[in-house]
């Protein structure tokens, strides 16, 4: 497949075993066929009733070009679960936030803080220090549709210990 993202002006290329397609218009969703099966695409949050992992992951984020160690102690997650399946309780509408710390560019990520977030989570307390950080948000719960806003972190300058 080939996808052009008009907003970011970039192309995505991948593979998906489908032999014919019909766009939405006559039908509510795009449809495709493969191996004598017809698939509805872009419908729901799951893979035909089975949950799959959805995630977004950042590249390393430097603070002061990586010249300063910083300590992260709190995070406001800013995630919305508004379009999740209506039968799910608020406790089941959740995503996992993983913050990873890196001491040097070639050293790899050494520490991780993992926090489960649901629709009532306003603040996460954590302890993580490094020169740069990576963020991954993921969900593996069936029926969950999440949207990431702008997470905020409370960070302070820290020494090189």
Where are the regions that the model predicts?
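Beta-sheet repeat architectures centered on beta-propellers
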Residues: 1-161
